[in-house]
């Protein structure tokens, strides 16, 4: 089981649960991006954590659990979100819409697979695409702004990159993914990631990282 705290940093949260984890004979590896638990009593540990922290923890083992925790967190903060995604092809939207009740916070998404859709619907500047390309921090920043233009939301997520197996370049080889999150009125947070694996694996890892970035912003 891997999870992270949404209302505090992982190191501080671990101090609160360390004694109980030892009692359950659970070993823990604490990192900035999450806490990984191992042991025979993971089921009991999960129940303990959910009882104690409710929606203030997010499991990172699968998209559905991550999205469910984020939806509850967004509800508590009275925030709505929409997305723009290219190489993930709708998987980011699906991570939210697979959860019953997501419509309370998830307003919709744009699968902007072509440059034309990025330009026409999201208003990504043609010069940005020509100078920096679709696989760039600059493109993702403008995709985020395009989300705010199309949806009445307080949060935006965007993904663009090379999922492979074809495509890519020396500057942006297959597996290079740019992921951005932005709160309305605040500066965008953009990560340049490199994921290994086949196309499906890279797409899934992109969605997982996007959900992680959203959790970090919240």
Labelled PLM ranges:
Residues 27:
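Short, surface-exposed charged micro-motifs
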Residues 30-34:
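Short Gly/Ser/Thr- and Asp/Glu-enriched loop/turn motifs at secondary-structure junctions
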Residues 1-24, 38, 42-218:
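Short alpha-helical segments enriched in small residues
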């Amino acid at each position: 089981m891997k999870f992270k705290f949404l209302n505090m940093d992982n190191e501080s949260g671990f101090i609160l649960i360390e004694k109980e984890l030892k009692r359950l004979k659970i070993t823990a590896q604490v990192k900035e991006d999450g806490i990984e638990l191992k042991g025979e009593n993971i089921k009991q540990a999960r129940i303990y954590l959910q009882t104690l922290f409710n929606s203030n923890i997010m499991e990172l083992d699968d998209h559905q659990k991550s999205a469910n925790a984020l939806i509850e967190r967004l509800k508590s903060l009275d925030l709505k979100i929409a997305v723009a995604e290219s190489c993930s092809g709708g998987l980011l939207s699906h991570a939210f819409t697979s959860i019953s009740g997501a419509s309370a916070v998830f307003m919709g998404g744009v699968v902007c697979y072509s440059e034309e859709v990025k330009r026409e619907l999201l208003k990504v500047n043609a010069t940005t695409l020509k100078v920096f390309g679709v696989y760039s921090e600059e493109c993702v920043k403008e995709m985020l702004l395009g989300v705010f233009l199309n949806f009445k939301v307080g949060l935006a997520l965007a993904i663009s990159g090379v999922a492979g197996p074809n495509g890519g370049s020396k500057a942006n080889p297959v597996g290079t993914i740019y992921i951005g999150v932005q709160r309305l009125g605040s500066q965008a947070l953009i990560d340049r990631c490199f994921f290994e694996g086949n196309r499906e694996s890279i797409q899934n890892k992109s969605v997982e990282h996007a959900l992680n970035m959203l959790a970090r912003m919240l």
